[in-house]
Amino acid sequence: MTRPVRTRFAPSPTGFIHLGNIRSALYPWAFARKMKGTFVLRIEDTDVERSSQEAVDAILEGMQWLGLDFDEGPIYQMQRMDRYREVLAQMLEKGLAYPCYMSAEELDALRERQREAGLKPRYDGTWRPEPGKVLPEPPAGVKPVLRFRNPLTGTVVWDDAVKGRVEISNEELDDLVIARPDGTPIYNFCVVVDDMDMGITHVIRGDDHVNNTPRQINILNALGGEPPVYAHLPTVLNEQGEKMSKRHGAMSVMAYRDAGFLPEAVVNYLARLGWSHGDAEIFSREQFVEWFDLEHLGKSPAQYDHSKLSWLNAHYIKEADNARLAELAKPFLDALGIDDAAIATGPALDAVVGLMKDRATTVKEIAEGAAMFYRVPAPDADALAQHVTDAVRPALADLAAALKAADWTKEAVSAALKATLATHKLKMPQLAMPVRLLVAGTTHTPSIDAVLVLFGRDVVVTRIEAALA
């Protein structure tokens, strides 16, 4: 194919968008970028009753968050109705389509008779014009549907980039309805006109569209268009092995942001959810674009693994800039009741994030760990009774005195802790646990010397001495 590469993502705005959906945007985006082509966003909103602006906004927001920028669009099918009607009129004029007056009840009865006879249920061509055929008289007051005049013989063939060579006999296909009685065009027809008008060269989409493909190819051929390369992606399964869907508990794309995942981690994970480059597990967006090809798309369903995504997210959090993570952590801190004013009273959030990020798998976890630096500690009474004993109080008093005089560095604080341990013949947990409780309000913190340095000398000494008073 010598045409410039043009790919598209064509979601229906009828609900939220999950990882399985957005993967059908990631791959055509990457292929367009790899081939220096054009990536088109098309909103297939002909299902007026189920489509919503809220769903469109969710699609746009999810793509923006993941950095899936489009070159053209969004193009809305509902804004192209005049074009569809123009093509329908041309097809009627050329005999490529015809009016069919068979009612839904008649069609149901026909299919039932076919099933009883052991035949495949299908439209029987009652209203299809043929040389020498006398058509029934159109019933009064009935508006017809329009049907595409599908070839009666021959085979539809395409070389699918994922499934290989696919052949479907035209005898298996009946004459597809392409417009409703009110003249509204049907999805399969609109898709063909759009792909033809937009010069789409590669259609990379879920394999739930495979059954539509032979019909779309026949319509495209009838209109004189050039069929694109098709790549039908296997289904994404959830952790229970079911098709990923909202009904089966799938999270929306933006729910991952709201849970504290980084977009680069989600993109990296999605890239590997149906495509591979050798054994590479971790790679940048730029590497993904450079390496991406259709030949290495998986042929089997890919199963979502939340622990794998969390592992990747932890990696990207460790690599991320502290200032960026601090900004991302602020909404989570705010949800914990810690606003900018509270943050201003404590240690620099960048530094706190730098300490917490090595232990976190999400930004939310960073915020939960950072919260202790911006709150008045309220340790559990039972924990205090367990750890702040009469036996350890003299050591706490000596430590407070040593910290008053020490240089305020991690090394000096560590030395003061070790000296106190030696003097009082204690092990580190016997001293570190009560210090953590009194200063931070919890026994779960990173390295005690690093934590104390961030709290600051005044806070640390004041809180220890207050407990001993």
Swiss-Prot record:
Organism: Burkholderia cenocepacia (strain HI2424)
Name under which the protein is recorded: Glutamate--tRNA ligase
Lineage: superkingdom: Bacteria
Classification of source organism: Bacteria, Pseudomonadati, Pseudomonadota, Betaproteobacteria, Burkholderiales
Cellular component terms (Gene Ontology): cytosol
UniProt key word Nucleotide-binding: yes
Record's keyword annotation contains Cell membrane: no
Disulfide pattern: none
Subunit-level organization: Monomer.
Keywords attached to this entry: Aminoacyl-tRNA synthetase, ATP-binding, Cytoplasm, Ligase, Nucleotide-binding, Protein biosynthesis
EC number: 6.1.1.17
UniProt motif 'HIGH' region: location: 11-21
Function: Catalyzes the attachment of glutamate to tRNA(Glu) in a two-step reaction: glutamate is first activated by ATP to form Glu-AMP and then transferred to the acceptor end of tRNA(Glu).
CDD domains (alphabetical): GluRS_core
Family to which the UniProt record says this protein belongs: Belongs to the class-I aminoacyl-tRNA synthetase family. Glutamate--tRNA ligase type 1 subfamily.
Residues that coordinate or bind ATP: K246
Main location: cytoplasm
Location of the protein in the cell: Cytoplasm
SUPFAM superfamilies for the chain: An anticodon-binding domain of class I aminoacyl-tRNA synthetases, Nucleotidylyl transferase
